[in-house]
């Protein structure tokens, strides 16, 4: 990889003044193992992947979404915090190893700092979250203003400082954070990242904050984020950064080549949510055409 950090213009991501056509697939367990299973970078498609931070130590999938090969309680091997809110050093060491391997393969990684989906959508997810008992009354409060933000800021600082030596890194505030996050939390995380590093930071769709749910995504324009991945590829009035089309927020686990093609014509970066073999969650349809399309534009 280059010795220069990645920068963002409205037209895309750049490194050494050269535009990077970032397109690739991502899945949940590339950093953390879930039920003892971890996915190798070699199983993914393209020159980019999104690295998830799952916050809970366990959950039950059952028949969620399109099914899973897992049954019973699925345990996550390591998360950012211990039960008392202190940082778990093993998590950051494990994360860094994956980023380093990606760098050797010329893969850019989008580091997703927080997540709401696994504590809000999955059975028993909140039960095993480190903050359960440390302040928030339920998942809807985890990514909102509260004393526990001290633990979250420490996590952001540790992640940014750990990954500062690597120039294949961009950051993302969080995956489908609760709508309570859009008033202050997401803006604050953007501020924290910008204080600690010059690497880009983006925001993405907040859970059920989209036009089809009767809510506007205009909050995105107020975050000072460098890039954004709104639901469905929507254009946000007043947002001046680069757009990403992440199928996780448009057609998650379903084939959508037409959507990828349209986003590519708009100049968006293309990120594909892929359940692969279904060890965690199954794809609803065959994503081979979507993977092939991504490979065809690189």
Predicted regions and their residues:
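Low-complexity, Pro/Thr/Ser/Gly/Ala-rich linker/spacer regions in secreted
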Residues: 1-3, 298
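Active-site mouth of glycoside hydrolases
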Residues: 3-217, 222-225
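Catalytic-core region of carbohydrate-active enzymes that cleave or remodel glycosidic bonds
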Residues: 200, 218-297
